[in-house]
């Protein structure tokens, strides 16, 4: 019934509207104590805890940035058994993003194409939401960015401020490689390093799925030079050749945007495998992108995530 009736009906509704409705339901669920207790008991994974530096993960399965952009429901999401959750991407000032519709399903490929444009409510709203965090229950990351990626001074000031502002609640931070030019990002990370000495929260670089393998040595060297603690591999891809089941007309109709979901799994695994073999062993490597089932998760672990 789900595949033949329910799913086709749901897929007629705009993907972002479905996402927003799920967020609303999670906000309602927040106040349903007995149901939350039951949910936690049902989704309590029988997994071996994992420790890295001073972070204690209840398990190795997390939720990437992009779902909880406003950091408004990470506590409720943790009831589903995630060992860590990443909120964001967050910028100092509100970003409306690109016009809707901006998230599209390609069900034949088990993929989404998104061109949201880093929409988020800004620092103050996210900070208010972060105050609901329950320490020790899960690891919480925050993906941060600047409103002015082309302005070195503003980018440095904004990202350093976000790192400091969220430090009471964030267990780690992520910055997207490619969202800021390397020469500006270098200046940003030099400034953040001074704050990091005081605050001590780790910083990861999230790499895009299309990063050339031959560029990874340079990125690893950059990361070591700037005291980066690890990598998340990978984010979306622009490579339309990955969409082997959708028609050209369907892909053209959707238009621009990054591909996420199953089609990017092999690119993600390739990057994870290279990082695992060549990055310093003390760096944490988190596999992301294309993980849809336990089979993909196992492949990520085998690759070194």
Predicted regions and their residues:
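Conserved, mostly hydrophobic/aromatic
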Residues: 14, 63, 85, 126, ...
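Glycine/Thr-rich beta-alpha phosphate-binding loop at enzyme active sites
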Residues: 27-29, 34-43, 177-187, 222-278
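Structural preference for beta-strand elements that scaffold enzyme active sites
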Residues: 60-62, 84, 137-145, 172-174, ...
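Glycine-rich beta-to-alpha transition loops that act as phosphate-gripper elements at the mouths
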Residues: 65-68, 143-145, 207-213, 284-295
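Catalytic cores of alpha/beta
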Residues: 72-79, 211-225, 276-277, 281, ...
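A gly/proline- and charged-residue-enriched helix-loop-helix capping module
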Residues: 88-137
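Active-site-adjacent beta->alpha loops and helix N-cap segments on the catalytic face
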Residues: 93-102, 123-124, 179-201, 210-217, ...
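Active-site glycine- and acidic-residue-rich loops that bind
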Residues: 147-159, 181-184, 204-224
């Amino acid at each position: 019934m789900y595949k033949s009736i329910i799913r086709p009906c749901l897929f007629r509704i705009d993907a972002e509207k479905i996402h927003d409705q799920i967020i609303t339901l999670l906000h309602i669920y927040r106040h349903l104590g007995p149901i939350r207790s039951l949910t936690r008991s049902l989704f309590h994974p029988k997994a071996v805890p994992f420790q890295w530096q001073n972070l204690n993960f209840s398990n190795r399965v997390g939720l990437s940035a992009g779902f909880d952009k406003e950091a408004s429901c990470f506590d409720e999401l943790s009831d589903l058994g995630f060992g860590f959750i990443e909120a964001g991407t967050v910028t100092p000032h509100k970003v409306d993003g690109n016009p809707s519709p901006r998230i599209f399903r390609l069900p034949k490929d088990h993929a989404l194409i998104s061109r949201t444009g880093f929409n988020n409510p800004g620092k103050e709203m996210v900070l208010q939401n972060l105050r609901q965090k329950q320490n020790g229950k899960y690891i919480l990351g925050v993906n941060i960015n600047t409103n002015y990626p082309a302005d070195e001074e503003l980018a440095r000031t904004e990202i350093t401020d976000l790192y400091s502002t969220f430090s009471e609640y964030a267990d780690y931070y992520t910055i997207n490689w490619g969202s800021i030019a390397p020469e500006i990002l270098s200046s940003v990370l030099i400034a953040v390093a001074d704050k990091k000495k005081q605050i001590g929260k780790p910083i990861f670089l999230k790499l895009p799925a299309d990063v050339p393998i031959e560029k990874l040595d340079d990125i690893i060297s950059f990361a070591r030079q700037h005291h980066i603690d690890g990598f998340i591999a990978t984010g979306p891809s622009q490579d339309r050749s990955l969409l082997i089941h959708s028609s050209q007309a369907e892909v053209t109709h959707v238009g621009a945007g990054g591909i996420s979901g199953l089609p990017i799994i092999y690119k993600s695994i390739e990057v994870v495998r290279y990082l695992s073999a060549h990055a310093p062993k003390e760096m944490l490597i988190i596999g992301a992108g294309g993980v849809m089932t336990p089979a993909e998760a196992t492949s990520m672990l085998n690759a070194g995530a």
